[in-house]
Amino acid sequence: MEANIKPKRIWRKVLLIIAGVMLFLFLAILCLIPPFIMKDMVDLHVNFSETYEASDFDLTANELSLKTKDGIKIAAYEVYTELPKAVVIFISGIHNPSVTSYFGHAKWLKEHGYASILYELRAHGDSEGNTICLGYKEILDTKAVVDYIKSENKYKDVPIVVFGVSMGGATAINSIGEINEIDGLISCSAYASWDDAFSDNMLNMGAPKAIAFTVQPFVKLYTDFKYGFDTANITPEQEIKKLGDRPALLMHSKDDSQVPYPSFTRIMKNAPPQVETWVRDGDIHFIVKENAFFNPEDDKEYADTIIGFLEKHFGT
């Protein structure tokens, strides 16, 4: 009898060991997926194939070099107008375009009485850095611009509005949540969190839901280790809660293929009641129609939405 029991116990132990090894390998694979996929996305300096000069838009810009709290030099371009109603800080996306593409927006806003400062995120263009931080550390870039504005007498008592697109939109929301000196927000196509965006895009590429959702917490774990656990709660869906009574305009397109629409709904679940929204049909990631990117007034619906928001809250 005992002779029969011993082999059973041995096989039970063997099966437990095999199951443990398989579980370990499975978890190891899940841990390796985020860095394997993200490495080529974030461990680089973006050198743009196309950049623009202010003169291309019949503008004059003051070129700035601003240093962040963590020692990164940020390139920025200031388009000033006398007695501005507000100064708008422009922030672009993860890999493109250069923020200099928004000189057309700066020209348009100047015609309406608004100054602009366009800055290249760390690890982009003429800014320093070799790691894209997905909106976690880029709030320090925004803070450097805000500190410059606050140091200039010409901007005394002038409201500050942050305007971001895609990862820049996420950075804009994170920035207004962390920087009290910012008075207003315009965000286009922001993701609710990076791990949400990662999971949503896996689903868009045809990955089974079970895999996409299983990988998501490992993406979060990876970004926490990579960017520091002090950034763990710095996500747009959390930072929007800190808006207080400041005005905000959030925009998204329903069929966005880069930052799927569920990110917008997640952010809005936590948004204060005064937050204004505009949703476009189709896949228009930059919200402005492609043929009007450099001349936003040519997209009347887009232009009216933004100017209407600015005039409503900062026009007097």
Predicted features, each with a name:
Residues 14-67, 77:
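An N-terminal hydrophobic leader/cap segment in hydrolases
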Residues 108-128:
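Conserved alpha/beta-hydrolase
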Residues 269-316:
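C-terminal catalytic histidine-bearing segment of alpha/beta-hydrolase fold enzymes
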Residues 132-153:
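Alpha/beta-hydrolase active-site loop
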